[in-house]
Design a protein with these regions (language model features):
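ABC ATPase NBD coupling module
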Residues: 64-78, 83, 102, 222-226
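Conserved ABC ATPase "signature" region
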Residues: 108-126, 179
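Conserved ABC ATPase signature
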Residues: 131-135, 139
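Conserved catalytic motifs of ABC-family nucleotide-binding domains
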Residues: 152
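ABC ATPase "signature
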Residues: 216-217, 225
Length: 240
């Protein structure tokens, strides 16, 4: 379980998160959507300690992350961002195995896990020895997700991971990710600018504006009972 308790964060004189409180239950697929500058990425990066709150606490399984070894914490959390974030000098195999090597996994176990994740993400094993620049955009994103899943994390953070791929590839990645969530039961926190994507993927959807929660509910209830004008305007975009 991830908990934000009375979180505030400012950059200079601009407060981007204001007295923010949220609980994300284990196994939730939470999609976060909102206006630019609404604090989406700030909230995401607070979970793995890349950004520290000015006030309040972030807890994972009842433990304040600031009391934890943050490097070790990040190795336990999968992280996927938009675009090519693979190590350009490493092969597909070595990119996926990166955290496993850091954790000193046995070579045979690494081989087994890499094969499993490649199969899970519909990546041909023939790609193992290729470098990232020899892959399509969709293949690169799949490798990034496979790497995030390699050490079987309980939490996966995704910051607009499908924003740089074409519509057909995006559709297939969305479908694959929904299936992955069912299989792994990991807690996924997923940022998007696309309300249709947010409603399609999330078991819960969080709508933000100016650092404040506008609505947090299951997709069906957000569609049937939008809480305010901001949420209504977002839903109109889904109808276009």
């Amino acid at each position: 379980m991830i908990e934000f308790k009375n979180i505030s964060k400012s950059y200079g004189n601009q407060e981007v998160i204001k007295d923010f409180n949220l609980t994300i239950e284990c196994g939730t697929f939470l999609t976060i959507i909102g206006s630019s500058g609404s604090g989406k990425t700030t909230i995401l990066k607070m979970i793995n300690g890349l950004i520290k709150a000015d006030k309040g606490e972030v807890l994972i399984n009842d433990k304040n992350i600031q009391d934890e070894d943050l490097i070790e914490l990040r190795r336990k959390i999968g992280y996927v961002i938009q675009g090519n974030i693979l190590f350009p000098h490493l092969t597909v195999f070595d990119n996926i195995a990166y955290v496993l090597n850091l954790k000193k996994y046995d070579k045979k176990e690494i081989e087994k896990i890499v094969n499993e994740k490649m199969d899970m993400l519909n990546l041909s094993r023939d790609l193992k020895d290729r470098l990232p620049d020899e892959l399509s955009g969709g293949q690169q994103q799949r490798v990034g997700i496979a790497r995030a899943l390699a050490a079987s994390p309980d939490i996966i953070l995704m910051d607009e991971p499908f924003g740089a791929v074409d519509a057909i590839t995006r559709y297939q990645l969305q479908k694959d990710l929904k299936e992955l969530h069912k299989k792994t039961e990991a807690t996924i926190v997923f940022i998007t600018h696309d309300i249709t994507e947010a409603l399609k993927l999330g078991t819960k959807v969080l709508v933000l504006d100016k650092g404040e929660i506008q609505q947090h509910d299951i997709p069906k209830k957000i569609c049937s009972n939008p809480k305010n004008e901001f949420v209504k305007q977002l839903l109109k975009m889904a109808e276009m």
